[in-house]
């Protein structure tokens, strides 16, 4: 059990969100105009349904709130806003936060320790984030705290806790589990060879299936060029689940860029 020292400041609703400015981040640059319009519509509903709560003196404004909402809705762009119905609040610290974590061991003794967290998702509770890592989530780098925590929420729709297997048809579960564990083993092999800091995929993905799904969801949306060629079978499963193909978006965007450069000559 974690005790949260909340001192909160809730944002007020704003009907005039700066969507054009909010979209102007590398993570969202490859979306088509139609996808951007649908993402904005989802983000508007997100801001109507969820409370963004700033903690410990952090101040939210309309641009920050709009960008947070857009990133929350990117994974469910083709799934629908109801896939985010498992929580009502997003709590935002200014930086990674320290919490008191209490846990019970196998013989019933309760232990307490202070733990630094970047974010948290709970089955029946809010999503907790921090602004420093949210800012780092704007880039197309493979790191995205919001998508990571959203992936946990999507994962938990399939049961009481995150397992690494989201809500997919039963016939696909065995194949998903096989490919996910193969990816975990491959990532661990690279870590053993070059070390955690030099690994091309975040080492956290090798810790357990739930974290592997969440970490690879980050790469799926923000660095598909690192995910798709390395784990092609698992990539296709992610495409089927999310009903999106960020790698295809990247190819189309690159081709359009090349065409634009040729037209200038």
Curated annotation (Swiss-Prot):
Cited Gene3D superfamilies: Collagenase (Catalytic Domain) (3.40.390.10), Glucose-regulated metallo-peptidase M90, N-terminal domain (1.10.472.150)
Binding site for Zn(2+): 111, 148, 152, 211
Enzyme class: hydrolase
InterPro entries per UniProt: MetalloPept_cat_dom_sf, MtfA_enterob, MtfA_fam, MtfA_N
One Pfam family cited in the UniProt record for this chain: Peptidase_M90
GO CC, alphabetical: cytosol
Example GO molecular function: metallopeptidase activity
Cellular location(s): Cytoplasm
NCBIfam families: PRK15410.1 (NF011939)
HAMAP family hit by this protein: MtfA (MF_01593)
Described function: Involved in the modulation of the activity of the glucose-phosphotransferase system (glucose-PTS). Interacts with the transcriptional repressor Mlc, preventing its interaction with DNA and leading to the modulation of expression of genes regulated by Mlc, including ptsG, which encodes the PTS system glucose-specific EIICB component.
Subunit structure: Interacts with Mlc.
Name of the featured protein: Mlc titration factor A
Taxon lineage: Bacteria, Pseudomonadati, Pseudomonadota, Gammaproteobacteria, Enterobacterales
């Amino acid at each position: 059990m974690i005790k949260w020292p909340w001192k909160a400041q809730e944002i007020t609703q704003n009907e005039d969100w700066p969507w054009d400015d909010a979209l102007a981040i590398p993570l969202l640059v490859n979306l088509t105009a139609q996808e951007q319009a649908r993402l904005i519509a989802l983000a508007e509903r997100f801001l109507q349904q969820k409370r963004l709560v700033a903690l410990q003196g952090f101040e939210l404004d309309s641009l920050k709130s709009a960008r947070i909402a857009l990133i929350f809705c990117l994974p469910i762009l083709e799934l629908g806003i109801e896939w985010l119905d498992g929580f009502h609040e997003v709590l935002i610290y200014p930086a990674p936060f320290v919490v008191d974590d209490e846990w019970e061991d196998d013989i019933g003794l309760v232990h307490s320790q202070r733990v630094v967290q970047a974010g948290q998702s709970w089955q029946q509770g809010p999503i907790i984030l921090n602004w420093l890592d949210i800012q780092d989530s704007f880039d197309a780098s493979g790191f995205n705290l919001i998508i990571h925590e959203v992936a946990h929420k999507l994962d938990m729709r399939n049961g009481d806790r995150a397992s690494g297997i989201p809500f997919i048809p039963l016939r696909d579960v065995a194949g998903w589990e096989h490919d996910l564990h193969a990816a975990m083993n491959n990532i661990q092999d690279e870590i053993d060879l070059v070390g955690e800091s030099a690994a091309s995929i975040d080492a956290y993905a090798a810790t357990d299936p739930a974290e592997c799904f969440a970490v690879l969801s980050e790469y799926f949306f923000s660095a598909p060029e690192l995910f798709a060629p390395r784990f092609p079978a698992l990539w296709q499963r992610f495409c089927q689940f999310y009903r999106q193909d960020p790698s295809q978006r990247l190819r189309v965007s690159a081709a359009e860029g090349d065409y634009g450069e040729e037209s200038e000559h």
